[in-house]
Amino acid sequence: MQLVLYGLFLVFLLVWFLRTEGFTSSPGSLVEDIKNKKVLVLFYNKDCGHCKTLKPEWDKAEEVMGDKMVAIDVTDSSNEEVKTITTKYKINSYPTMLVLYNVNNTETYEGERTKDALVSYVQSM
């Protein structure tokens, strides 16, 4: 019985480590983190009502799409890194979703704000 439980535990650990996850980034490291990648980036403010509605759907989509999506918290507008990144990408309202390819803005996502719509869009990028 212990051997079976041990085996199940190992399988669980394997599944846990192999699952797809998004990656984390920050305003200061975004440019380096997405270098040579095409990703959908969410710029959000924790105090924004629309951001609070979107974030759970974003998180579900990010679990499926892994490193093709990243959310950047830009709540602290007094932070120099936040100022730099929001100026660079002309972020004036929240939430804003941009497709960035090799650090350059290629388009703004204007579609539905649901897990399925986000996943479908990212798969088509």
Where are these regions (language model features)?
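Ser/Thr/Pro/Gly-rich low-complexity linker/stalk segments immediately outside membranes or between
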Residues: 20-34
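Thiol-based oxidoreductase modules, predominantly thioredoxin-like and allied folds used
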Residues: 43, 62, 66-83, 112
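Non-catalytic, surface beta->alpha helical segment in thiol-disulfide oxidoreductase systems
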Residues: 93, 98-125
